[in-house]
């Protein structure tokens, strides 16, 4: 399945041409964050790249809050996320839309797949899937080998009485050579292809708890919102063939895909909300102004030539996909460097290891006693940071 023959407009080289040139469709990008916690630096980088790419092409941005999962149904975090984007100066032109308001659209799409005989109930548990020691897809999920694909109606009824099934989408078998392979061109990582039967397997479109799967929801939403360009972290590169296959089945257009490198911690971990890596609340306090944060981030990731404070608008002229392609390896972000970069004066520069070691022993009540043990007055910026960290314990 070669998507380049379907609804995909590829950029043309500049230069003279005698052929008539049609006006390209306007670019529509999107922010699609999940309110499962405060944004971290990696989330900011992803949103920044999506915004810069759309704006550099005269395009628009749609904001969609992906809150299908129970852990994401937190209005206060969604409101904080929206406030953070506004503070960064990453304005959007449409939205915010909330996925929890769009369940009827996902239900309609799923029913279309079911009516075509493309889905089946799956009773396998997560533990069973991992215990099977199956090969894993490019996104780390086990490749499903079809244990429930051929269940009889009687067996489905018997198992359904015991537990609710998930719903899986059938992918072409290895014998369906014309449709088995999905090909696409990623704006950063180039030509990609995946054999669905051997590298992906039948995948979920609805979980056993009734929640629609990410793959189905984003495909429906991107089409409904007119999204023509998807910019996101390279950890989602492996999801793209599944989404393209769903677009093909549902008769939906395929956007351009552009995956960007991940920001990593110094110990090799991907930055995450769960691990409480530096979030935007702390970054806003330390950098003070959005221009300082965005300029520093642009300098660290190669978007700009240096870390000079710049607004999002000022970074548009520096943005180039050629630069992203040249720096497509994952980028290590050093927390100590951030602490030092944002210190107001030399005597306020912090050793993040000391900060962490101290705050693990502190309660808010014990903070003043800790300050009294110091040989000299604590700089105000340091004191504020430690107070906040102590309150988290």
Model segments located where?
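Non-catalytic terminal extensions that flank enzyme cores
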Residues: 1-37, 61, 157-158, 174-176, ...
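N-terminal Rossmann-like or analogous alpha/beta NTP/dinucleotide-binding catalytic cores
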Residues: 2-138, 234-235, 239-252, 309-310
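Generic structural signal for secondary-structure transition and capping sites
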Residues: 90, 118-119, 302, 324, ...
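Active-site cores that bind ATP or allylic diphosphates and position pyrophosphate for catalysis
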Residues: 127-273, 279-284, 335-342
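Short, basic amphipathic alpha-helical segments that act as recognition/interaction helices
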Residues: 344-358
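Short linear interaction segments
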Residues: 359-393
């Amino acid at each position: 399945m070669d998507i380049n023959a379907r609804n995909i407009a590829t950029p043309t080289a500049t230069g003279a041409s005698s052929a008539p040139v049609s006006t390209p469709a306007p670019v529509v990008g999107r922010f699609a964050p999940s309110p499962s916690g405060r944004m971290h630096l990696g989330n900011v980088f992803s949103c920044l790249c999506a915004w810069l790419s759309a704006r550099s092409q005269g395009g628009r941005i749609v904001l969609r809050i992906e809150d299908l999962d129970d852990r994401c149904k937190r209005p206060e975090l969604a409101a904080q996320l929206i406030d953070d984007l506004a503070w960064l100066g990453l304005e959007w032109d449409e939205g915010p839309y909330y996925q929890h308001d769009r369940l009827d659209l996902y239900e309609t799409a799923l029913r279309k797949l079911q009516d075509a005989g493309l889905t089946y109930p799956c009773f396998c548990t997560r533990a069973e899937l991992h215990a099977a020691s199956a090969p894993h897809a490019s996104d780390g999920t086990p490749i499903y080998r079809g244990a429930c694909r051929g269940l009889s109606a009687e067996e489905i009824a018997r198992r359904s009485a015991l537990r609710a099934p998930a719903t899986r989408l059938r992918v072409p078998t290895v014998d369906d050579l014309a449709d088995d392979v999905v090909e696409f061109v990623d704006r950063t990582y180039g030509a990609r292809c995946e054999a669905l039967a051997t590298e992906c397997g039948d995948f979920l479109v609805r979980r056993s708890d009734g929640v629609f799967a990410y793959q189905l929801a984003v495909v429906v939403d991107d089409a409904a919102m007119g999204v023509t360009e998807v910019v996101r972290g390279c950890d989602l590169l492996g999801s793209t063939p599944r989404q393209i296959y769903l677009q093909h089945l549902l008769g939906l257009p395929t956007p351009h895909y552009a995956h960007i490198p991940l920001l990593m911690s110094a110990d090799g971990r991907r930055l995450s909300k769960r691990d409480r890596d530096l979030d935007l609340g702390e970054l806003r306090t330390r950098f003070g102004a959005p221009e300082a944060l965005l300029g520093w981030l642009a300098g660290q990731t190669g978007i700009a030539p240096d870390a000079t404070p710049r607004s999002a608008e000022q970074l548009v002229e520096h943005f180039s996909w050629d630069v992203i392609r040249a720096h497509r390896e994952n980028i290590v972000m050093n927390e100590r460097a951030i602490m030092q970069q944002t210190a107001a004066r030399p005597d306020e520069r912090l050793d993040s290891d000391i900060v962490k070691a101290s705050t693990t022993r502190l309660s808010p009540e014990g903070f003043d006693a800790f300050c009294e043990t110091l040989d000299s007055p604590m700089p105000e910026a340091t004191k504020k940071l430690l107070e906040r960290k102590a309150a988290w314990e």
